[in-house]
């Protein structure tokens, strides 16, 4: 294949040809000899034949030269290795070695690519003797191709070693004939793949031709043997030590980088490469140019000494004895050489095969890409050539289609109108026919009706698109068979005749021959031709007529006859007669003939139609006779089969129902029996647990009483009371001697005998008591071992020797005086400490649980010398209170406050990490006070210490036994635990059970049965008002009595004021009602109930979010969408500041608004030269005007005025206006503003001239005395004397009316859509900028206009104690027309409307006004922090002083805030969050508590109101609770009352009464919440459906599919979590927001997630109402009121 490759060189930045061989380093240099497109793709070379090793290097069997380099190119963009200095110019790398890494892609041209026919797979024949422009040395590699090994076969079989290894001196070589070895084109394949040329420089003369080609191949080797030895540096490595051939695709191998000198030389050679890189136009290089500008530096000429040395060495070699080639001793070397040659040949063949495949594959890919590119280009050309015409054609077609569509629509309308008119005509004709008396007239009307009917049918067919003739379309729905054929091809389009055939048997149709069929076809065709010619068909067929008809029919269908030409007769009379005859014919005869023809046609068509119908009936008779019996048989068989199937189905269904009924009865009876057995088993299990707890309580009580008797000497102390309290009769020998502890799992509750259970309960209870005492005894009896304490790293505590008298008095170190009930509590706590029992002090809030706990620590320190360590854990909000109380009441006990950052806590731990042996009075601390959060964080440090006493304040924080806080606290080493809580029961009985489990984990184990009994019976009693088992209640009280002490205020504290609770009901405002109705219409209560029955967690979360949205509506609608501040679109530049933090208390913010439009003035106009009124060296006119016109020639000069003031001079009027000559001269030099400013404040001395009335007419001034200088009338105008009075109003009618009607206080009705400051004038002159600033910010002018004194002037007035009246003047600018809008168009939301938009806030506004007048102070509690933000705006609007405390308040700020409220009576309101501000703080300065929104946990509200109703409160505390009527808040309040009743029944033991608990008994909390969203009607409907479902034995709301939620339950997200996330936990960083509490986005107005379906109207869609007309009106009114706000589409 000849010619250059059919493609262009590829840029090195393009995609690699071989992706799988891509090198790891992408920054290698580009070697042009390894270009991807210099392979010869079209040829697929044949595989190498197996050759001997000797032939592998022969020129007769050459290998194709490898396209890969002989050596690995240097990495990282280095230059190729240096060439040998003595190498020939043909083998030296030319100046291209110094080219950049990436060469530019060359275009396809004959000057670069080869044009000869040299193939790369055989020996190439050079075309001329010029040296190659392509180096044979280290070729360049493409940066995208894989590196090949350093070994490759050359074109003559010579291994491709580096040039330095193959180049030998050529001095002793015989002269040879120089043959052209390469093509002239350095980029051709022949130039690359041909063998090496002669190693002589170009200037040498060609040598004579060589003898044979074989020695040519062996010439380098022989020359190497005969050449004299060279120095070591220039000597090539011997062939015997040549490296083994490397694999075909090895990893890249690193080589040394060339020196900087060689690299610099290559860079210097770049221009030479540029000169040589442009070949001549004919594609050949000029030898002269190549000789003059060689590619490599000239060879070094040998000196005479070196030449002599070389000759001497060569002579010595010639004189040496020649060895025999066939001599033995080299067999192994020969074999090794042969093996290596074969191996090299095989490796080369294998590598070449791989490369051949890769070249072929790459060529095919390239070819495919070329075809694809050409196809794409062809498509683009076609598109460019034809796109416009196609678009025009399509547009024209669309236009034509649109015209046709319009025509069709017009035709359709005309036809419809025709049908309507013809129908009217038909009805009218039928009506007239019915009324007609004459038969002819009646027939006439009937014909008219028939014509109208036919026209209607025709028009309807045209409308329906039916194009078949009427007479054919009515016979059969199929098209007519024009080709003829048998009658069997007719379609059965009519029902069979009602007449039954008289024949009984089946009738077979006779067969027809081909002749008969052909005759029928001919007859049909002739008939059709006759119909087309409008000829009548004969009654009998005639053969001759048939042929004529056939012939005429075909002729008519095909072509009409040519008329005979007639010659015209030209005559005027003839023409007139002819035209008259034709006129008469057209006027009279043609319509008549037309009517006759139409009538005959209709008659003929009707006859043909009847004939066709009769023929169709006749043709179907044989089918009826043939298929009738078979169809009847099949129908009877099918009917019988259906009846049988229905019978057996019914039978099987009945049997299945009976079987299921029997099975169901058996299952129900089995379930009933199993339920009874399980009930008995649960009863025994519960009885065992209660008995065990009762026995433990009994033993504890007996131990305490025994200790009391031992100490007092009386063993019968309160024996009767004990017997009355505990009615248990436990004999002394009831417990067996060997009875041991029995695990709960090992007990058999199925046995009928309960004696074993009783014994096990008694043994377990006694063992629990013994364990508690042993544990306390072991804690106290720890021996003092300092070394052991040092070794173990734990503390050693002293043991009290005696507890002293049981009647404990107040400790002397306690500075406060304990009350009687507090002293009893101290006795109870000491008794518990003595027995080693933990307890719960559950006194009502405000009774001094803190002081009782402190007194216990003081007692232990004073009486028993136990100084700790004591651990107090409290909420973060009460830590400062604990520290202050301990320091205040017991100064001897040292307190270590443990809170702060991690670094601070690490420093504090040094106080108690030291290994103290004892804790004495001199210890560094005795009590450590910390919070629950820090205990959990530093639990590892607290567990190392043995605490003497651990006090947990507000113990409801550990109400969950599954929390990490509960588990960590349970693992602390302490002798006793004391829980302080004012509300042991908050939500349910399980919380109380968790506290009991915490104080006695061994006894009060977390048994599900006991917990269920605790919760279910009592709560169901509170809900359903049922009778609680008195025995169970007494047993419960007996269980709780030894461990819990609770007193209430009304029983123990008589001097404490009363607490009055009032529920204040509020109504929804119009806006709130619209929001509430919109939310309720978006959800379906029935769907929520059904989903709640399934128990999906996602639905529960959705329901809680809905409750949140409803409560937000009740609080304030602005929680959804705030009224925004509105202003026009201002196009201006505004100054920006980063922060005001570094500014002082007073920040002067200057006017910095600039217009976007700037008008630049030339510098000349702003200078003195361009100003007419500014004098200067460049402006002589201003000086002339000022000197001559303003002074010398001024008419207001005093001299001129003096001369002109006499008699009737020009200035004689000055005497009448009370102006002197000096004043007139001074005013002439002032501007308008200065003159107005000087007149400000001066009284109108001439106002008396305006007086037109006198008390007496006689006192009226005379006419000649009115202009006298002496005042004759000192009376002033009445309207100026006083601002009040009728005269003042009469003189200012418009102003007084405007103010009296309130027009100046209404809000502006409209505002401009956009605003902009004036155009800014700019100039490059600094003086112009200064002048404009002085004009804009002139302080005296601004003070005169706005009457606003500067801050500096006010400070001077205060410092110098001056009278401010002279410095205060009314503003010169008039008052604004609107006091709301004033001088700005910025509209701020109205606070009055902000108050009236919420019913609660409006009621609170009235309440606070009354409380403020009565001198009360208020605690205002909220559930939502965003509502507190809104309340702050309201209090600022009403000018009420307030302070705030919520979950975001810092710990140090909280203490100062509480102290400010307690000590500053001017603070009227204290805003608190229910959770954050309801624990452990004393706010007795307030006597009024207002709950803006209540918590559904009543104990939280009780704690909050007890912040004011506690010890130290001397006034009556009034609690107001704001409740929105008819909303979800009423139902939440009812639920809170139920919880209060549970607490009262359990703790106080009272009976249920006083509260109506006849509410719904729901087991599912989610269903209860869903019921809160329903109104009364919906609740009644749901109750009715529940009752119906219970009557049917179904579960209301359960899924019919029977699918159960089997997935693992997540932690319940309660509404408390959603309301109070982050509150109450000041330092709790782990509390992450749930994302459901108080969303800020206004997009959540609806509050309904996407998963909640919107109810639809109709049957079975629940009670959700759709959008009514009233709702739409509400939405429109809301948008009008709120400024296009609201809930969106409802």
Swiss-Prot record:
From the UniProt annotation, give the residues forming the signal peptide: none
Q: Where is the composition biased (Low complexity)?
A: 213-227
- Residue span, Helicase ATP-binding domain: 830-1002
Q: What cellular-component terms does GO give this entry?
A: chromosome, centromeric region; chromosome, telomeric region; Ino80 complex
Enumerate the PROSITE patterns for this protein.
DBINO, HELICASE_ATP_BIND_1, HELICASE_CTER
Question: What is the disulfide pattern of this chain?
Answer: none
Q: Report the subcellular localization.
A: Nucleus
**Residues bound to ATP:** 843-850
Q: What's a Gene Ontology MF term here? A: DNA binding
Task: Note the superkingdom of the native organism.
Answer: Eukaryota
According to its UniProt entry, one GO biological process term is: regulation of TOR signaling
According to the record, the residues making up region (Disordered) are: 1-306, 395-527, 618-637, 1619-1690
| Annotated Helicase C-terminal domain residues | 1403-1563
Keywords, sorted A to Z:
Activator, ATP-binding, Coiled coil, DNA damage, DNA repair, DNA-binding, Hydrolase, Nucleotide-binding, Nucleus, Transcription, Transcription regulation
User: Locations of Polar residues compositional bias?
Assistant: 30-41, 111-127
Report the EC code(s) recorded for this entry. Answer: 3.6.4.-
Q: What InterPro entries does the record tag this protein with?
A: DBINO (IPR020838), DEXQc_INO80 (IPR031047), Helicase_ATP-bd (IPR014001), Helicase_C-like (IPR001650), INO80/SWR1_helicase (IPR050520), P-loop_NTPase (IPR027417), SNF2-like_sf (IPR038718), SNF2/RAD54-like_C (IPR049730)
Motif DEAQ box extends across 953-956
Pfam families tied to this protein: DBINO, Helicase_C, SNF2-rel_dom
State the protein's purpose: ATPase component of the INO80 complex which remodels chromatin by shifting nucleosomes and is involved in DNA repair.
Family note: Belongs to the SNF2/RAD54 helicase family.
Its assembly, as annotated, is:
Component of the INO80 chromatin-remodeling complex.
> What's the protein name?
Chromatin-remodeling ATPase INO80
- What gene does the UniProt entry assign to this protein? ino80
